Amino acid sequence: MPSCRWTFTRSVPNRPNPTTRPSQFLASFRVLSNSNFAPFAPAVDMINLPYWCGENQRFVNLVTSDIWQKEVVSRVRAKGFKPLFFFCIDPRTAAKRKGLDDKPFKTPDDLKGIKFRVPGSKILQQFYRLLGANPTPVAWGETPTAIKQGVADALDPAVEALYAFGFKDILSGGTSN
């Protein structure tokens, strides 16, 4: 009888690329954020814009639409991946590292010169560059260290991530949508 082995991890530092193809006869499932998946399947990068879909139903409408299947899913499949579903964790929050200043982001001008942590998403890098920030690519697993060392000044995770990954101790307040 076939068996199934489940492995759950919070992060996978020092591990092979999480998007590598599985061995023959092995089903491999990965849960990746769209921003971390975008370098391997750039078509999904369009949904990385913070606050783009807003409400969950709008996101569901987008990723289940015929045009999404035609323009995005077909390109992801052409790269050798088969997405089971897309997910969006919102709202996002923009939070600064402790010691930078105590003021929350309120306007785009507040981002000028800020070293803003971004993943491998080209769209997010361009988004923050247009707002006047200095987008700083940092892998998710290295983000707490980068924030502590001042390599990055701010980031925009979902509120849940601030608590789940220990950021509440290294970031001052945040601004959420």
Residue ranges, per PLM feature:
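N-terminal secretory/targeting leader peptides
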Residues: 1-59, 74, 82-177
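Hinge/lid segment of periplasmic solute-binding proteins
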Residues: 62-80
